[in-house]
Amino acid sequence: MNYRHAYHAGNFADCFKHALLADLVDAFARKPTPYFVLDTHAGVGRYDLEGDAARRTGEADAGIRRLLASQPAPLKRYLDLVRSLGLYPGSPTLIRALMRPIGPDLVGEGHGCCHDVMPGAGPASTPCDAEPDKGVDGGPSAAMTTGTGRRARPPKSASMLMRQADRLACCELHPEDVIPLRRLFHHDPQVEVHFRSGWDALKALLPPREKRGLVFIDPPFESQDEFATLADGLKRGHGRFGHGVFAAWYPIKQRAAVRGFHATLKMTGIRDVIAIELYLRAPTNAERLNGCGLLVINPPYRFAEQGQMIADAVLQGLGQDESGAGVDVIRIADE
């Protein structure tokens, strides 16, 4: 768990996946019924692009700052959100901004809550007026309990609110990153924060009670077998939530590893799978991040066309002109 996204926030890969993510979430608002979003690798939620970590790499200068300056028309929705949210939004902040708010007739005072789950523990809630509790080592403590030793339940009105509204569940396993994530959503009745593995959440949190939703998987790709782990996670998640939309980000260094991942997923028998890929350059140097892709299972209507337009706009806005730069839309499995 050495990966820290603060060093890479706002880079070209972030812009690509977040612009596509915004379009996916918007698609769910076309119907009035509530939807659920699971963000399996949420991070801290928002990032200071003027901070030491971001400045050390300068990746945002060649990413989001270029797009904000060039303003490609197909990215207006995404870029307007980035501007309006203050600190640069990570995926959970972006998703939350796109979710439909609870109507004023449903909201009661003091009923915001944020669920915290420790690895191996069942769901529990933290009182809304409490600061995020810490263990003796400064890390997140176990979920709070009542004086009788039983796990505290959220207020009834909060539970009712979450049943009637769009809902987001964020998972983060890094003990330092989960604390600011909990603070960010501590009073939000539509958001749950889980201190647990996102891979485990694919079993524990699916299927959702809302019956429709999006699973966003954005792993750090720290290990050599991450593509295999991702393929297995998608297979297990789809097995529990077959009609859900799954979106998984992956890096492109060399083409062979990516095509092997696609072939593995095709062998699972999962239907209706596409991938949208963006290349900054030809993927010939395995030491560089040459591009990235977003694989989508059960994509919304016309998402392939919309996704290609968004990816083309990202590439154009970044001003990339290296040999091999481009966008590709791949049909991995038919409907």
Regions found by a protein language model. Give the residues of each.
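Acyl-thioester-dependent acyl-group transfer interface
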Residues: 141
